[in-house]
Amino acid sequence: MYGALRKALFLVPPERIHGLVFAGLRAATTPVPLRRSLSRRLAPHDPVLASTVFGVRFPGPLGLAAGFDKDGLGVHTWGALGFGYAELGTVTAQAQPGNPPPRMFRLPADRALLNRMGFNNHGSAALALQLARSSSDVPIGVNIGKTKVTEPQDAPADYAESARLLGSLAAYLVVNVSSPNTPGLRDLQSVESLRPILSAVLAETSTPVLVKIAPDLADTDIDDIADLAVELGLAGIVATNTTISRDGLKTPGAADLGAGGISGPPVARRALEVLRRLYARVGDKLVLISVGGIETSDDAWERITAGASLLQGYTGFVYGGGLWARSINDGVAARLRENGFGTLAEAVGSAAR
């Protein structure tokens, strides 16, 4: 049924329909009786799916990835739709408009999206106010990025300001140095640049801190970031962000859409490779959150057994619809029982053991 609805929705420009659908989801989950009704049907209630990760209790492993709810307007929404948590942002220390539109595109033959949003958001102070007056029945993480006008040498202070404002209001923080849509941002993934940023954020908050990395990094750079994360005592790594690669795309005209990061199935293979490499490198020293191209419960199960304690999706939600998260949760719960696991944690990394 959603397939027919999706065809109609896809007749509207991507950013516009995103706003309309998001507004509709918020409206549908604002009345408490409606939200409770949806939660009974869609939320992960099976205890086998629950886990405690970096001291936070997650009712299910699948979260909403950063980028969908940049300013925390739907904090009350995501648990009722089946997500075990949500990651807000990316938010920057200063409010900024992002890149000029059009800046979001569909690649339907690839079931993918291309975006060059450029961290459009209302700023960390505004998100802090929003979180202070909001409530959620699932953990809420916050993804923080660098303000575009901030010079690279001032990046540590910029990230630290967001951490200061948001740390106490979030279940965890993610330092985003991997978006391809802010000039020079990915250069901050070098250990020399990343160390002072992470150190500055850690100095501002006792909330668990993770770093989000790009799929386009060389393997040696992934190893270096993993080692740095362990050294500094980070809670974990989010792998991966969108890719700038255009290899293997099937959608006609995709090459003409211009700059931006691609999410969905085109990044899945590399996201899994990075996850496996990270797990082999750090084992249980860090929590690994896998994101990128997860569409089915089989995909989710593969990531969990490869070492992911938590998962995230955005593009899969766009193409899969409102029942997507529940289908992932139901499939993972079935696989846990089929394979004799009593808890989700027992399955994490089991394919590598």
From Swiss-Prot:
Chief place where the protein resides: membrane
Catalytic activity reported: (S)-dihydroorotate + a quinone = orotate + a quinol
Sites where the protein binds FMN: 66-70, 90, 143, 176, 212, 240, 264, 293, 314-315
Presence of the UniProt keyword Oxidoreductase in the record: yes
Record: active site: 179 (nucleophile)
Cofactor note: Binds 1 FMN per subunit.
Superkingdom, taxonomy of origin: Bacteria
EC category name: oxidoreductase
Cellular location(s): Cell membrane
Subunit: Monomer.
Family: Belongs to the dihydroorotate dehydrogenase family. Type 2 subfamily.
Protein name: Dihydroorotate dehydrogenase (quinone)
Native source species: Mycolicibacterium gilvum (strain PYR-GCK) (Mycobacterium gilvum (strain PYR-GCK))
UniProt lineage: Bacteria, Bacillati, Actinomycetota, Actinomycetes, Mycobacteriales
Gene: pyrD
